[in-house]
Swiss-Prot record:
Transmembrane segment boundaries: 28-48
Membership in a protein family: Belongs to the tumor necrosis factor family.
Glycosylation sites: 272
Keywords: Cytokine, Glycoprotein, Membrane, Signal-anchor, Transmembrane, Transmembrane helix
Job of this protein: Cytokine that binds to LTBR/TNFRSF3. May play a specific role in immune response regulation. Provides the membrane anchor for the attachment of the heterotrimeric complex to the cell surface.
Keyword Glycoprotein set for record: yes
Protein localization: Membrane
Annotated Pfam families: TNF
Protein's recorded name: Lymphotoxin-beta
Annotated organism of origin: Marmota monax
Biological process according to GO: immune response
Length: 310
């Protein structure tokens, strides 16, 4: 008798079913083993590509922003290649997203100030320095000084005194101005004195102090001075009930004035005072001077505009 094969239910041999089951199991195992590395490789291959896409997108946005900035500033096209993009910026992380999670950060350069004006903006014009004429205009400032045997004299080189732009001073002839023009003249004389002696009459109790500015020379001649400006001050004592003066041991006052005068070249200005023995020579008390403030027509020279007494 021959050998009989194994049969299962339905009359089918059991060896064929086991073989098919083994083949299916092996196929599933191989498929599972191959799927894992393929998946890993696919992930590794896709992730850099996406990040690179983000970087390229940020670079594209940065290039567009830089291109628009260069157009608004008037930069030539040859400078576009010199502007680094965000992909070359070491401070920008590739693929870094903004706080909103929508757009990546774009690194841009600070705006470049162009020499050409931008439409819609006002351009400040350079202010040219104004020419200072004060240093070239004739001017003088003299201070009072006491000189032994002469009394009041004028100092032109000490303390605040000065002569500028051709002005000259002589104690005998006065202040000479170098050119025709409109000048501002000023004078201030300080006075001080003591109470009058007791028993003096009423007419001797008041003292009127005068200071005057004269001009001479030029069209007026050496011996024909003309009064330009003058100021006066009267010192009157306060009387007590008995009618006696109540002077303090010393009294102080000053006479000051100034005004505009049209002067010609060669004319000289000098000061005349009524009580030279009462002049106060302390610093800042007695002085006079002149400063040119403008030009005037030659036909109107010789006129004087007086100002009120100070």
């Amino acid at each position: 008798m021959g050998a009989l094969g194994l049969q299962g239910r339905g009359g089918r041999p059991q060896g064929t079913g086991c073989l098919l089951l083994a083949v299916a199991g092996a196929t599933s195992l191989v498929t599972l083993l191959l799927a894992v590395p393929i998946t890993v490789l696919a992930v590794l291959a896709l992730v850099p590509q996406e990040q690179g896409g983000l970087v390229m997108e940020s670079a594209g946005l940065g290039a567009q922003a830089q291109q628009g900035l260069s157009k608004s500033n008037g930069l030539p096209s040859r400078l576009h290649s010199q502007i680094p993009s965000s992909s070359k910026n070491p401070f920008l992380r590739p693929g870094a997203l903004s706080s909103h999670g929508k757009h990546p950060w774009v690194a841009t350069l600070p705006p470049i100030v162009a020499s050409t004006p931008v439409p819609g903006f006002q351009q400040l014009q350079e202010e040219k320095p104004e020419t200072d004429l004060s240093s070239r205009l004739p001017a003088a400032h003299l201070i009072g000084a006491w000189m032994k045997g002469q009394g009041l004299s004028w100092e032109a080189k000490k303390e605040e005194a000065f002569l500028r732009s051709g002005t000259q001073f002589s104690g005998a002839e006065g202040l000479a101005l170098p050119q025709d023009g409109l000048y501002y003249l000023y004078c201030n004389v300080g006075y001080r004195g003591r109470a009058p002696p007791s028993g003096a009459g009423p007419q001797d109790r008041s003292v009127t102090l005068r200071s005057s500015l004269y001009r001479a020379g030029g069209a007026y001649g050496r011996g024909a001075p003309e009064l330009l400006l003058e100021g006066a001050e009267t010192v009157t004592p306060v009387l007590d009930r008995a009618g006696r003066p109540q002077y303090r041991p010393l009294w102080y006052t000053s006479v000051g004035f100034g005004g505009l005068v049209q002067l010609r070249r060669g004319e000289r200005v000098y000061v005349n005072i009524s009580h030279p023995d009462m002049v106060d020579y302390r610093r800042g008390k007695t002085f006079f001077g002149a400063v040119m403030v403008g030009l005037v027509p030659s036909a109107s020279l010789g006129k004087c505009l007086h100002s009120a007494n100070v």
